[in-house]
Amino acid sequence: MKITELEPKQLWANFASLNAVPRPSKKEEKVIAFMVAFGKSLGLDTYQDETGNVIIKKPASAGMENRKTVVLQSHLDMVHQKNNDTVFDFSTEGIKMLVDGDWVRAEGTTLGADNGIGVASIMAILQSKDIAHPAIEALFTIDEETGMTGAKGLKGGLLSGAYLLNLDTEEDDEIDIGCAGGVDVSAFREYDTIPTPTEAVAYTLSVKGLHGGHSGMDIHKGYANANKLMNRLLFTCSEKFDLHIAEINGGGLRNAIPRESVAIITVDKNEKEAFEKEIAQLTLDLQHEYAVTEPTLNVLLSPTALPERVMEIEEQEDVLRAIYAAFNGVYKMSQSIADLVETSNNIARVELKNGEINVYCLTRSASETSKNDLADTIRAAFELAGFEVEYTGSYPGWEPKVDAEILKIVKEQYENLFGETPQVVACHAGLECGILGTNYPTMEMVSFGPTIKGAHSPAERVNIASVEKFWKFLLSILKNIPAK
């Protein structure tokens, strides 16, 4: 079956058109132009702000003119992750999609259902001639995935809606009313190099086959972090062998749990056999520890050409200790909402090469003070090893308002349509609502969406039936918005 044969047809057709346009975070120029052209082609009031956000306004349908205005909001960018063996350029190529049973997925890359399905649904409402809806202000933000740049840059006074529906939640039976804030923690230092020992052999050491996933929504699931596993291997072996590091390249985006890490190392040739046995045993240890959550975990060791220079040994010890000590994973659970992560950290990327090392983390929390506490804990670990540490991109959480009028409306429509009560939740991820609310404090907000699994990884997929359910839900909400 083709994507465009799925229901609702207009939504899926829009998703296909959107995914034909390259739209990785930080490189949204093409999709911004696409969306501006789309709005103008419909003859609708279309505006691009100085940050790159696109706002398209559509008058109410006949008979709905006295209803409160609704902002429909989704982000244009997508996480650009691919499998190592996938040849793909996110800056020039469109996503290759396919129907796989009950799901739609991509071929070896992220799908972009996060948040492309939301974008496509808003496009369908803007296109419609027969859908009952109040006045619509469609807000398409940029760079949600790597800095919330669009939400942060949106000025007050551009929107007049009473309610905002964020379409970026990933479980079809959930209504989100709160989320975590976050801060980027970056550690940097230079290091001395020495000539590679003459009696050495070189290897490429790889950690592969990990689950990956969203560093907020999946952080509590026990998935392994490739950067932490690589550091554990190097730390353990450096205490037993004359091991030197030439390069490390691990992880990718801050909001994705790292799936792979690759290092170039050397050991004394007289230790070659013992070293290979040690790696084999450590691999078995890790596979046993992560047998349930990481069934495809693998560690590969292959000979490679000798590098010219390697890291000075004392500095190497300092760096390995720092990464080992830096906290990763769930730091604190919520005291008020069952099973909700309050505070966490993801050691997202490690780059070590040519005398420089960079470590990039994303610290999240629903509590501003706990967020700062964990960030300081991580900073302290790295500063002990001579790193310079900086905090950037801090953004606030979204405080739940359980008595909001829009929440009552949304819950009622869900119960009427599906005969069951939705889960009202807060999430451990960075929705834009908290940031948007700083300039629009009286605007009531909720978030919902279709079921998406594996977001931020090449395993990303969206459930087909949930998209149709989400669409019916969205239309029912719009039809039942109250009078001004």
Kindly give the residue locations of the regions a language model identified:
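Active-site metal-coordination/substrate-binding segment of hydrolases
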Residues: 64-146, 151-155, 161-162, 188, ...
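Midchain, well-structured core segments that form catalytic/ion-binding scaffolds
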Residues: 102-105, 145-146, 152-364
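Active-site-adjacent substrate-binding region
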Residues: 218, 225-227, 232-248, 392, ...
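Substrate-recognition/cap regions that form aromatic- and gly/pro-loop-enriched pockets
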Residues: 340-429
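Acidic, glycine-rich active-site loops and adjacent beta-strand->loop/helix elements
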Residues: 76-78, 139-147, 169-172, 211, ...
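Zn-dependent metallopeptidase/amidohydrolase metal-coordination segment
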Residues: 7-11, 335, 342-355, 418-476
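Acidic/His- and Gly-rich active-site-bordering loop/insert found
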Residues: 2-102
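His/Asp/Glu-rich mid-to-C-terminal helical/loop segments that flank catalytic regions of hydrolases
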Residues: 223-240, 269-272, 317-324, 332, ...
